[in-house]
Amino acid sequence: VGFKAGVKDYKLTYYTPDYETKDTDILAAFRMTPQPGVPPEEAGAAVAAESSTGTWTTVWTDGLTSLDRYKGRCYHIEPVAGEENQYIAYVAYPLDLFEEGSVTNMFTSIVGNVFGFKALRALRLDDLRIPPAYSKTFQGPPHGIQVERDKLNKYGRPLLGCTIKPKLGLSAKNYGRAVYECLRGGLDFTKDDENVNSQPFMRWRDRFLFCAEAIYKAQPETGEIKGHYLNATAGTCEEMIKRAVFARELGVPIVMHDYLTGGFTANTSLAHYCRDNGLLLHIHRAMHAVIDRQKNHGIHFRVLAKALRMSGGDHIHSGTVVGKLEGERDITLGFVDLLRDDFIEKDRSRGIYFTQDWVSLPGVLPVASGGIHVWHMPALTEIFGDDSVLQFGGGTLGHPWGNAPGAVANRVALEACVQARNEGRDLAREGNEIIREPCKWSPELAAACEVWKEIKFEF
């Protein structure tokens, strides 16, 4: 075939409705809003081309490779019900296009260039199917849910956490004191805020030392294993690992990373270090809403969650369904299951476009955090189940009597909900009653119930 210069329609090469997807393909579901007058087939083909082998014009060097082997293919397009001029384009990518064990490379290919494309008004990556042939090239979470429970010796209930507030401005000593009080009161974990790194008012090394002191004081007093998510996020990967090494030397159980601002390369390095050195890894999703909040442009959080499970993390923030941050119940539970379970069936009502088989990749604990308090406990226990971390920042530290009583109130409320559920009671219907009963003998819980009885974040 002679080389023929010029510009030709993408759909001639990249729109292949009769393509049978392979088990090894990475599949993507894009929500496209084409510019007026651009047919959906051309738009879908353009997405497939620009995120794989294509460029805007025919090039001579195409003849030196096999496009059929390497090109992305738009294999199906369906209109979005109830939306004008919006379509779901399904694209299949051959596995050879991606470097093994690199979320960074996967995203650079699939979402790197195509979102600025002129033929599209908007584009959103709604879901990805990661084939086992690719997921097997990733270490994944350093430990996973079962190993974490075994390390902490905590079973049969959600774990309790608390973000230390005010997030910025405390000295290291006062910060450690707040950590101790929460852990002593009955929480399993306390947490550095995502923007606590190493600022002038509290350098990281001082914070690590005082938080370790708090842990080692609270553990013998409560007879429980405690942890504080020490945020190792830093300006360079080397500095981040240095902080993780110091945490390991202190003997603490868990460190933390902001995976989107820190970047997937840094996150994967840290996850490998954590597995090699027995540290749990808590992941915060700071910056996610910049990427995932728009309904028709960006990347849905379920894709960012899948990417995190591949890159590695033992906990990740995933919305609350009930607190101050946005999240719809079915959709949230869809990506919560994608984080925890081995095998998730396609279910469009939960936003899951593809059946996902993680094989043996460890699971991630979803963290519910943001504007939640004791009255939410029955709903949270019911929605998230045992394999979750419930994090009450203001809902602990805002207690009228202080941090430790705030922690007591949350632990009593949680234990009451778990017991009620195990006795077969209906948490959704009897939730308020289940919280009121222990108030009779727990003044801490009674005080918390009084303070937050009217608080709702309903918009």
UniProtKB/Swiss-Prot annotation:
Q: At what positions is N6,N6,N6-trimethyllysine found?
A: K4
Q: Where does Mg(2+) bind?
A: K191, D193, E194
Its annotated compartments are: Plastid, Chloroplast
Family annotation (Gene3D superfamilies)? Ribulose bisphosphate carboxylase, large subunit, C-terminal domain, RuBisCO large subunit, N-terminal domain
Its main localization is: plastid
Example of a GO MF term: ribulose-bisphosphate carboxylase activity
The record's section on InterPro entries has: RuBisCO (IPR033966), RuBisCo_large_chain_AS (IPR020878), RuBisCO_lsu_C (IPR000685), RuBisCO_lsu_C_sf (IPR036376), RuBisCO_lsu_fd_N (IPR017443), RuBisCO_lsu_N_sf (IPR036422), RuBisCO_lsuI (IPR020888)
Q: Name one Pfam family in it.
A: RuBisCO_large_N
Q: Which reaction does it catalyse?
A: 2 (2R)-3-phosphoglycerate + 2 H(+) = D-ribulose 1,5-bisphosphate + CO2 + H2O; D-ribulose 1,5-bisphosphate + O2 = 2-phosphoglycolate + (2R)-3-phosphoglycerate + 2 H(+)
Q: Which GO terms describe its cellular component?
A: chloroplast
Top enzyme category? lyase
This chain belongs to which protein, by name? Ribulose bisphosphate carboxylase large chain
Q: Which organism is it from?
A: Parnassia fimbriata (Fringed grass-of-Parnassus)
Q: Which gene encodes it?
A: rbcL
